[in-house]
Curated annotation (Swiss-Prot):
This is 3-dehydroquinate synthase. GO terms for cellular component: cytoplasm. It comes from the Bacteria. The gene is aroB. The lineage of its organism: Bacteria, Bacillati, Bacillota, Bacilli, Bacillales. Zn(2+) binds at residues 186, 249, 266. Its main location: cytoplasm. HAMAP family: DHQ_synthase (MF_00110).
C-alpha cells in the first residue's frame, strides 16, 4: 500500500492507495483525532452497498465507532437536490454533530454528493473519500463537490477538501467494463493535458481495456492522481491552471445535461468532448493531430467518437455557454496546443456552431 500527502494552499491530507487500503481506515481515523465513539455516516449507492457496505461497516463497528449509513440510487441522476436533501435529513435524524465524519463509499457521484453534504451540514463537517471506481481517481482528489441542476452539471457546489482519501484497489475488481472505460477517459485526459511521456506509455501499453489491470491499472491511478494533485496544489480554487482539468468537459457536460444525466457515462461524454476539443484545436492553431488518430484510438476502447444524432448544435451551444468557465455568455474551452500543453481560449458562437456541425458530419473528426 502506498501512502502520500495531497497538498493544497489551505490543507494537507493523506492518500492511501493499494490493495487492502480500506483496512487502514480505523488507524487513519484515530490519527485524524476521531476516537472510538465518533459518529461515522457512510453515504453509498445501491450498486456498491451490496458489495462493500457490510464489510466496511463491520470493520468500523469492530473498532468501536458509531456507524450509520444511507444508500442513494446509483448513476449520475442521483446528484440531485432531492437526494442531497434526503442525505441531510438522514444526517440530522442520526444526530450527527460537528465532530462526526461522513464517508463517501462509491464512485464520483457518491463522492460529489457526499462531499457537498459534508460541506453544508452544520456549515461544514469532515469527510473521507473512499473511491470504488477508476473515475473517482480524479474526482476524489481536489475538494470540488457538487450536485447537478437540469440547466447544468455540477452547478451547485463548493470547494471542500476531504480529511483523507482511502483508495482500496481491490474495489475495482467488481467494476463493470463500462465504468472502467468511463474512468479511463479521465486517465487519458490527464496524460493529454500535462504529460506526453505518460500519453506515449498509454498508447504503447494499454492497447485495450483488458490491459487495464494489475500494475498497469495502479500506475494509471498513481499518474492521474499525481497530475491532478500537482495542479490543485498550484490552483486550489480554479482561478487559473485548474481549469485545464476541464479539457473535454465543456462539450462533455453539455452532452450529459442535454441528453439527460446517465444516458452517457461521464467518461463517454468527456471522450466525445476531448475529440471535439482536438478538432477545434486543429482549426484554431492550424496544425494537425492526424498522426495520432485519436478517434481510432478512442474507438478501440469502445468509446463513442461522434455526437449522438439526436442532439442539435444550437442546443449544445446554449449548454456550453452555461459552463462554469464561460464569461458573460462567451464559451471558453480548454484546447490542445500540443500533447501535454493546453490553454483556455474564448470562442465565438458562429465558429462553434459551424465546428459542431462539421464535427457531427465527420463522425468525430476522424
Amino acid at each position: 500500500m502506498m501512502e502520500r500527502t495531497i497538498e493544497t494552499a489551505t490543507k494537507q491530507y493523506p492518500l492511501l492507495l493499494g490493495d487492502g487500503a480500506a483496512r487502514a481506515l480505523p488507524r487513519l481515523l484515530r490519527s485524524l483525532a476521531c476516537p472510538p465513539g465518533t459518529k461515522l455516516f457512510i453515504i453509498t449507492d445501491d450498486a456498491v452497498a451490496p458489495l462493500y457496505l457490510d464489510e466496511v461497516r463491520a470493520m468500523l463497528a469492530a473498532a468501536e465507532y458509531d456507524v450509520y449509513a444511507y444508500i442513494i440510487p446509483s448513476g449520475e441522476a442521483a446528484k440531485s437536490f432531492d437526494n442531497y436533501y434526503a442525505c441531510q435529513t438522514a444526517a440530522l435524524q442520526c444526530s450527527l454533530d460537528r465532530r462526526s465524519v461522513i464517508i463517501a463509499l462509491g464512485g464520483g457521484v457518491v463522492g460529489d454528493l457526499a462531499g457537498f453534504v459534508a460541506a453544508t451540514y452544520m456549515r461544514g463537517i469532515r469527510y473521507i473519500q473512499m473511491p470504488t471506481t477508476l473515475l473517482a481517481h480524479d474526482s476524489a482528489v481536489g475538494g470540488k463537490v457538487a450536485i447537478n441542476h437540469p440547466l447544468g452539471k455540477n452547478m451547485i457546489g463548493a470547494f471542500h477538501q476531504p480529511e483523507a482519501v482511502v483508495y482500496d484497489t481491490t474495489f475495482l475488481r467488481t467494476l463493470p467494463e463500462r465504468e472502467l472505460r468511463s474512468g479511463f477517459a479521465e486517465v487519458i485526459k490527464h496524460a493529454l493535458i500535462r504529460d506526453r511521456r505518460f500519453y506515449e506509455w498509454l498508447r504503447a501499453e494499454v492497447k485495450t481495456l483488458a490491459d487495464l489491470r494489475g500494475e498497469a491499472l495502479t500506475y494509471c491511478i498513481e499518474k492521474g492522481i499525481d497530475i491532478k494533485a500537482s495542479i490543485v496544489r498550484e490552483d486550489e480554487k480554479e482561478t487559473s491552471v485548474r481549469a485545464h482539468l476541464n479539457f473535454g468537459h465543456t462539450l462533455g457536460h453539455a452532452l450529459e445535461s442535454e441528453l439527460g444525466y446517465g444516458t452517457l457515462t461521464h467518461g463517454e461524454a468527456v471522450a466525445i468532448g476531448m475529440l471535439f476539443a482536438v478538432f477545434v484545436s486543429e482549426r484554431l492553431y492550424g496544425h494537425s493531430f492526424a498522426e495520432h488518430r485519436f478517434a481510432e484510438w478512442f474507438a478501440r476502447y469502445g468509446f463513442p467518437v461522434s455526437l449522438p444524432t439526436t442532439v442539435e448544435a444550437d442546443r449544445l451551444l446554449e449548454k456550453m455557454k452555461g459552463d462554469k468557465k464561460a464569461y458573460a455568455g462567451t464559451v471558453r474551452m480548454v484546447l490542445l496546443r500540443e500533447i501535454g500543453d493546453v490553454e483556455v481560449v474564448e470562442l465565438e458562437d458562429d465558429k462553434l456552431l459551424a465546428w459542431l456541425d462539421e464535427f457531427a458530419k465527420q463522425g468525430g473528426g476522424r
